[in-house]
Amino acid sequence: MPNIKSAIKRTKTIEKRRAHRASQKSDLRTSIKNFEKAVAASDVALAKSTLLVAVKKLDKAASKGLIHKNAANRQKSRLMKKLNVLSAPVA
């Protein structure tokens, strides 16, 4: 435990920020899982709408520094591929 007053304050601030970021990351993962459930159910309309939500949250997380920009782009690319496979016409 810190003894200096400013260090005590920083510890409280760090804990608040950690909890906030954990909540945001959890929300992000939930939106991605919702998309993957829609893909598993082969529901193209639901998959498209949940993909928009997931992409928006990924972009927001990347802009806020919650995740790296390249990580967000990689995840978006993988989600788009899943949607393209689902919505491709069966030959």
UniProtKB/Swiss-Prot annotation:
Residues 7-23 have a biased composition (Basic residues). InterPro entries: Ribosomal_bS20, Ribosomal_bS20_sf. It comes from the Bacteria. Transmembrane segments: none annotated. Residues 1-28 are annotated as: Disordered. GO terms for cellular component: cytosol; small ribosomal subunit. The keyword Nucleus does not apply. GO terms for biological process: translation. Keywords: Ribonucleoprotein, Ribosomal protein, RNA-binding, rRNA-binding. One of its GO terms (molecular function) is small ribosomal subunit rRNA binding. Binds directly to 16S ribosomal RNA. Belongs to the bacterial ribosomal protein bS20 family. This is Small ribosomal subunit protein bS20. It comes from Brevibacillus brevis (strain 47 / JCM 6285 / NBRC 100599).
